[in-house]
Swiss-Prot record:
Phosphothreonine modifications at: T339
Record's keyword terms, sorted: Erythrocyte maturation, Phosphoprotein, Repeat, Ribosome biogenesis
Gene3D superfamilies, per database record: Leucine-rich Repeat Variant (1.25.10.10)
HEAT repeat positions: 38-69, 74-110
Record's function text: Plays a role in ribosome biogenesis and in nuclear import of the 60S ribosomal protein L5/large ribosomal subunit protein uL18 (RPL5). Required for proper erythrocyte maturation.
GO biological-process terms attached to the record: erythrocyte maturation; protein import into nucleus; ribosomal large subunit biogenesis
Entry's family note: Belongs to the nuclear import and ribosome assembly adapter family.
Residue numbers carrying Phosphoserine: S15, S144
Sections of the chain in a coiled coil: none
Protein name: HEAT repeat-containing protein 3
Annotated segments matching region Disordered: 1-40
Protein source organism: Mus musculus
Biased composition (Basic residues): 1-11
Length: 679
């Protein structure tokens, strides 16, 4: 497998309320295709209104509108970014915050093209200026009594929104990252990060941004001095006051890993142990139990609050009865509470935030471990190895051309990473995370709309753990994985996970993750002559379902699994019928799959299965393998010539050229086999 980049989770969707409800309703009904009287035109026009409250509500309406994909072209045509940008420096703090919120949503929902357009329209100039102003404001800001009562710092909230915009555009635009480097944004965001003891939300946003901008950015690494590293170290080692601090530590661990090239060699072992120690800590937490506990706590809190409201309502009711006859007493006026950007978000109760923070931290931890194991990415299509067993080399001799040399370089871990992985018990904790999500927690979340997104998060953690397991099994010595018995137990565990889900074939992410893990595990077991616990029938069930997947990765994995299994069975007696079944399956895939990547892997699997062994030779003759491959050979050459240059990368074409050459040699080998058996 190649490197698995950390992916951000989707932003909370804005839901304008109270005085902004009319603007929000107008935005919700818009399609983005309307003429000048549509919601986009009206909202953008109100951005220039002399009233700060009107400008604020217009920004809130735009924050809602940009979530509707059809509206994005209309907003771009009307130059929404150039109109929103100046409002980041508006005289009203509330307008600044809602404008930043609208740009945050726009950058999150619009993707690469929109973010590039935002940078082209110079959003970075007011954004960087706002970040600098907020930094000064945080140091000198005096909150009003009401703000203190609400435990809410408006300048900090603006900074948080601005950092999220910065993160989004830097994740999607190389030009934004370049500006980040040149404008000294690193120093600004590190000053924000220093405030983690009192401003955890802001610190987490900064940590996300730092993890993004430090990836593959050697220019920025030059700006990291001892002071900057100490800021990261203090965040990494901070005491845990909540699950959000766990998330912060995990993100900072990922950032420090991105800085590995500037860490002195004498300190690397210590730093790697600190990183993996933090990741081990988060993976050691039971997410299922945490979700259950947090939901119970929320239920109890809401119950207590409802009881308190009932008592207060009854008391107020008694007072109103006494005042009924007092005609001069006006009706009680409903106070209009000031609308903050947090009001524009869906309700995020503290228990839900805690649960989501832990789940996100665990997902991030697993992704960082995968990156640590796969710092070099030789191929995007999981088929850097041209052969999955030594037997195929018996007849192919030195069959690999020079261009495949870098593809065949074995993955390896430094001694420091290898030791830290085992010392921090990472393999054991990753194994635990491969289990299916806690059924009680899933049931609880499924019954509550605001908690339901946690189910997808729990499933994502399982998939990340399976991908992480694949890396660990491929790279660690089997002794550090628990030896042969542990690998056999793991194979049974993966089999149970797979076949306990009758509809597993419908979930491509899960199927790709578990087939990748199985592929690596079976390869390791085969190379060490460890008996496999999954039956050929079980594997054929997986392969028959997986080969119909729309994911090329899944299809590559299942044919590779059959190649590994078949090459093992070819050494045993009484396997003729199974080998024939495997051969027919692989032959059909090789000749009918629309992807040359899958075709190449299927041919390679055939080379492995039928490279050697009496049963394999008999099976190849009985399924007429030689005739089928001779017929397919010119078709394969033509497909490479016709489709290759336009659809596949140079590395993939290099591998396909090797498969083409190996096919010629394999046909020659099969001719000698058939002649010997039929003469």
């Amino acid at each position: 497998m190649g490197k698995s980049r950390t992916k951000r989770f989707k932003r909370p969707q804005f839901s304008p309320i109270e005085s902004c409800q009319a603007e929000a309703a107008a935005a919700s009904n818009g399609t983005g295709d309307e003429e000048d009287d549509g919601p986009a035109a009206e909202l953008l026009e109100k951005l220039q209104h002399p009233s700060a409250e009107v400008r604020e509500c217009a920004c809130a309406g735009l924050a809602r509108l940009v979530q509707q994909r059809p509206a994005l072209p209309d907003l771009a045509r009307r130059d929404a970014v150039r109109r929103l940008g100046p409002l980041l420096l508006d005289s009203s703090l509330a307008v600044r915050e809602t404008a930043a919120g609208a740009l945050r949503n726009l950058s999150a929902c619009g993707g690469f093209d929109v973010c590039d357009d935002m940078v082209a329209k110079d959003i970075m100039t007011p954004l960087v200026a706002l970040l600098r102003e907020c930094l000064s404001g945080l140091d000198s800001n005096e909150m009003s009594p009401q703000e203190k009562a609400d435990k809410r710092n408006p300048v900090e909230s603006i900074a948080n929104e601005a950092v999220n915009v910065l993160w989004n555009v830097c994740e999607c635009s190389g030009r934004a990252v370049s500006i980040f480097n040149k404008e000294g944004c690193l120093e600004i965001v590190l000053q924000y990060l220093r405030r983690f003891p009192t401003s955890i939300d802001l610190a987490v946003s900064v940590a996300y941004c730092l993890q993004t901008v430090t990836e593959d950015n050697p220019e920025l690494l030059k700006s990291f001095d001892g002071t900057a590293l100490r800021v990261l170290e203090s965040a990494l080692l901070c005491p845990v006051a909540s699950m959000e601090y766990i998330l912060l530590k995990t993100l900072v661990a990922g950032t420090i890993w991105n800085l590995k090239d500037i860490i002195p060699s004498k300190s690397q072992a210590e730093i790697i142990n600190a990183i993996l120690g933090a990741l081990s800590e988060v993976l050691g937490m039971n997410t299922g139990n945490m979700v259950i506990q947090m939901k119970e706590a929320e239920t109890q809190r809401l119950k207590t609050a409802a009881e308190s409201e009932d008592i207060l309502a009854n008391a107020n009711g008694d007072d109103l009865v006494e005042d009924d006859e007092m005609e001069e007493i006006p009706h009680k006026r409903k106070l209009r509470r000031k609308t903050f950007i947090s009001d524009l978000l869906p309700p995020t109760d503290k228990e839900l935030r805690e649960a989501m923070a832990l789940l996100t931290a665990q997902q991030t931890a697993l992704e960082v471990i995968v990156n640590m194991c796969c710092s070099e990415d030789p191929s995007d299509d999981e088929w850097e190895e041209l052969s999955s067993s030594d037997e195929s080399e018996a007849f192919m001799e030195n069959s690999f051309s020079e261009c495949s040399g870098h593809l065949m370089s074995p993955l390896c871990l430094s001694h420091e990473i290898h030791s830290a992985l085992t010392n921090c018990l990472i393999p054991e904790k990753v194994f635990e995370k491969t289990s299916s999500p806690n059924s009680v927690a899933v049931d609880i979340c499924s019954k509550n709309p605001t908690w339901k997104p946690l189910i997808r998060k729990m499933n994502t953690i399982q998939c990340r753990a399976l991908m992480c397991l694949q890396s660990l099994v491929s790279l660690l010595d089997i002794d550090h994985l628990g030896g042969a018995p542990a690998l056999q137990t793991l194979a049974q565990h993966l089999s149970q996970i797979l076949f306990s889900q009758p509809d597993f074939a419908k979930h491509d992410d899960f199927l790709e993750a578990i087939s990748s893990a199985l592929r690596a595990l079976l390869q390791t077991m085969a190379s060490k002559n460890i008996p496999q616990c999954m039956t050929p029938e079980q594997l054929m069930t997986l392969c028959r379902e997986g080969i119909h997947s729309s994911s090329i990765g899944v299809r590559v994995n299942v044919v590779s699994i059959l190649g590994i299994t078949g090459s093992v069975l070819a050494k045993d007696d009484g396997t003729l019928d199974t080998l024939k079944t495997i051969g027919c399956f692989l032959l059909e895939v090789a000749t009918k799959d629309p992807s040359l990547v899958v075709t190449g892997e299927a041919l390679d699997a055939l080379f492995d299965v039928f490279a050697d062994g009496e049963a394999a030779e008999k099976a190849s003759v009985q399924i007429k393998l030689l005739a089928a491959l001779k017929e397919f050979q010119p078709v394969f050459k033509m497909k490479i010539r016709k489709e290759g240059r336009g659809k596949y990368s140079p590395d993939q074409l290099c591998v396909l050229d090797n498969v083409k050459m190996n096919l010629r040699r394999f046909i020659a080998y099969q001719e000698t086999v058939e002649k010997r058996l039929t003469s």
